């Protein structure tokens, strides 16, 4: 299995990370940057540009440069937010045949999922260049307030990009994973995530590997793009007052204004004044016109104050839903580039009554969390499990790779169900509980959700320990998975809430797949033990035949080779009975080979003993040849 990568598919920038051993690592792109602009463009000759190259040419090619397309993903054309977006961007937003909002360039239309897929492909290529291996699986993050259509559209983007999306997880939850993975101290945190296009706030309780989402709230159309556009509007208004020219009618000028606004916004986070200087922004009959303007931090904050204030109400709602006061929040984690703005930090401090935590990189923390979740799914990271309530069966992997259901699909929640399992080997002191979701008989054919270990089982014969595995789903959709050794009372459990998951299409596909393959699954299940035993016998017989075949009579040797060939052929299929029959035939035929091996060993031992008896002690004289050595010049 190749590496599973974690991708933060952002409105303004995207980021990719991967687990490097036990540590998540952000991967630099071909341009040497740790984040990639979420921009796709088509040049005059039809070449597709993604990331920094697309951003560099945006000013001269505004109508074919798509940015902030994440705001359109999963939205209908008649959505009020789409109507608002149409007035803000220089590229064309059109109505698709299915009623969705798509984008258009040179008479070609693209779905937002398709444009997002181009960005995901760039992330995929970045990871492959770093790892030196093919990558085809990923965990992708989405805003916590994304609806089902938006989540599914994001998953579709992954598929178009050639990625199997193992999990869609919430951005604040991913950030909490990155923040809290190595924190020993339990507590309640708030994740305040103000990114390029969306705002989310989540309240989480963290402790002992448990990441429990208490509440979430947000706005999927509030972010850095709105701050940029507010400044663009101000610059256009000021220029019109001075020069009498409306720059909004000039798409090229508008794109230059947007770039300048973004740059000024970033600069004003670290300085109190900046200058915007755009020579030759436009021209009239009197000649070229230039835009030069000083902008103070105070003026910018006044322009966007209502946008910052819009983040307060979702925070209050999230606190109320969690049943907590601002004073009960132990730490406020800032996520998203916009949280670098001093005004935003000030509002957060006033609201929660404490300085926000600035120990994580707001541009990278979400991708890092996605990489951690990818590590969980791969088994590289343990004691962390993000679970959603699902209409598919929940169970664990047992001996032979079999999927043993504990809670069947369509079980009404809240529910709690336990099942007792045992060890597979003598003196086994630990068991790994691998949790799966699906309808197939073999665990590998289902979706792995995570794993954890139950340690400290007293040494005893296999099959003797009684390990009770319990799945507990409450009315809030929070899943508890625990394993308890009934003899010692030792227990290990994980509880996590996340709101990603499988779409209806995925569920339908898995159920239909299970129905179609039911008979085959049953045969494969029965064949597991038979195949394991047969494989071991084939290997040992081949080795013995190569070493001792000459000691066996020709007819017996031929019988062994025929039986070996028959069993190899049977192993190509999944007929358990045929494999068992051929295994028995080979076992009988190879008995003569075993006799020859024992006979040869006995003869070798006898020869060794005889040689020992024939050893004669001898005297020897040491000769020093140095005296006779001739020296030459």
From Swiss-Prot:
Acts as a chaperone. Gene3D superfamilies: 1.20.1270.10, 3.30.420.40, Actin, Chain A, domain 4 (3.90.640.10), Substrate Binding Domain Of DNAk, Chain A, domain 1 (2.60.34.10). It comes from the Bacteria. It comes from Rhodopseudomonas palustris (strain BisA53). This is Chaperone protein DnaK. Belongs to the heat shock protein 70 family. One of its GO terms (molecular function) is ATP binding. Coiled coil: none annotated. InterPro entries: ATPase_NBD (IPR043129), Chaperone_DnaK (IPR012725), Heat_shock_70_CS (IPR018181), HSP70_C_sf (IPR029048), HSP70_peptide-bd_sf (IPR029047), Hsp_70_fam (IPR013126). Induction: By stress conditions e.g. heat shock. HAMAP family: DnaK.
